[in-house]
């Protein structure tokens, strides 16, 4: 709501969120990039997981003190959150994360950013329209989404014409554990739309599935492409260190 004079009917289960947000605590680097695309940098008051962020202007703002470094998204810095006094917290509801701990008890409105739980790439992309309304950028967000949607469908029509489908193994292990997209996830759909044969397309479910290194290696040896997402510079030596196979 934009009517700050409305009578309060907040409870433990329900909070009033006043829009547009002017000082948000953003917990994911993904959403920082999205907000930057919409031109809402000034509404970002604090961010988590700075080490995963590649936006130079945000890092500079943190260095200058214009944006608060809130630490880990799993255990945000409570003192800095209190000092920030944000309009809302924007965390992602990662499975088995244990919630936000003490941050949930501070009384700030929490807007769970569940876009990663969508089972199609365009379904996830359309969440920008929701964020656009939170930050007073509805028209900008709608325009961005329509461009992305049109381009995505155009690319899909091209990949459907290909005769060969390279076999794809995605991801790397995290802390020694492989977790790969299940068949109903947006990632699996993305691989399919890109014209690849995802070698673990038989994994049931909509999220991710933990797998043993043995199983990944056994089937991964059949892959033509190993698709790795990494937030920094990556070389073969580092891959061998992080992924001893």
Predicted regions and their residues:
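A short, structured surface patch at a secondary-structure boundary
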Residues: 2-82, 88-95
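Extracytoplasmic substrate-binding proteins
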Residues: 66, 77, 83-90, 96-177, ...
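Flexible, glycine-rich surface segments
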Residues: 155-243
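Stable alpha-helical elements in mature extracytoplasmic
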Residues: 20, 30-34, 40, 77, ...
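Beta->alpha turn/N-cap motifs
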Residues: 92-96, 229-232
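A short, gly/pro- and small-residue-rich
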Residues: 43-44, 102-115, 236-245
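Ligand-binding cleft/hinge of the Venus flytrap
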Residues: 39-41, 54-64, 104, 187-201
């Amino acid at each position: 709501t934009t009517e700050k004079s409305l009578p309060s009917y907040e409870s433990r289960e329900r909070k009033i969120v006043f829009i547009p947000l002017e000082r948000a605590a953003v917990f994911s680097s993904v959403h920082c990039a999205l907000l930057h695309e919409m031109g809402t940098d000034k509404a970002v008051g604090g961010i988590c997981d700075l080490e995963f962020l590649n936006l130079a202007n945000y890092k500079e703002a943190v260095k200058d003190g214009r944006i608060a470094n809130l630490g880990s998204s799993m255990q945000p810095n409570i003192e800095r959150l209190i000092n920030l006094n944000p309009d809302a917290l924007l965390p992602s509801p990662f499975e088995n994360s244990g919630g936000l701990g003490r941050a949930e008890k501070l009384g700030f409105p929490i807007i769970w950013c569940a876009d990663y739980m969508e089972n199609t790439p365009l379904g996830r992309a359309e969440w920008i329209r929701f964020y656009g309304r939170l930050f007073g950028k509805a028209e900008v967000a709608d325009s961005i989404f329509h461009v992305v949607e049109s381009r995505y469908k155009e690319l899909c029509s091209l990949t459907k014409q290909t005769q060969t489908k390279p076999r794809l193994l995605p991801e790397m292990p995290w802390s020694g554990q492989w977790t790969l997209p299940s068949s109903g996830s947006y990632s699996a759909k993305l691989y399919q739309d890109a014209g690849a044969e995802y070698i673990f397309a038989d994994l049931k479910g909509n999220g991710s599935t933990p797998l043993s290194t043995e199983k990944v290696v056994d089937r991964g040896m059949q892959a033509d492409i190993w698709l790795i997402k990494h937030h920094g510079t990556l070389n073969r030596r580092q891959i061998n260190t992080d992924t001893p196979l």
